[in-house]
Amino acid sequence: MSILFINGSPNKDGNTIKLAGNLLEGKEYNILHLVDYKIYSYGQEYADDQFMEVIEKMKEADSIVLGSPLYWHSMSGSVRNLLDRSYGVIAEKEFQGKKLFFVFQGASPTQEQLAAGDYTVGRYAMLYGMDYQGMATNKTEAQKLAENL
């Protein structure tokens, strides 16, 4: 089973990576840092856009772990952009059955902020027929989710 961790933090060694490490510990996985890719906003088309490269890597994975810091009361812009751009690009069954996990961390998030992120990722999974396993916001939750990975 192949696992892809998509790091939506601009910090490659930050808290999002550390929290994801609790979920991914002992597993073989590939990591994709969104900060390394040019992914333009929905509706913009440029020759150097690398969005489809990310989608192809997602297609190859059996399980996807999506990680984001909580910035300005929500998920990072790079993660939001990835989700937004997916609409109309992913064929109906391309992601069907893939497991999706969400790692979401911040300094002192409110329950409303966490619920909004969880809802958004859960709806994304539902739209594409993915098996949403849930969200981890701390080490204990990440280790519990790891049982399903």
Residue ranges of predicted features:
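N-terminal beta1-alpha1-beta2 submodule of the flavodoxin-like/Rossmannoid cofactor-binding fold
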Residues: M1-A91, G122, M126-Q133, T137-L149
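Short, glycine-/small-residue-rich phosphate/pyrophosphate-handling segment
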Residues: Q96-M135
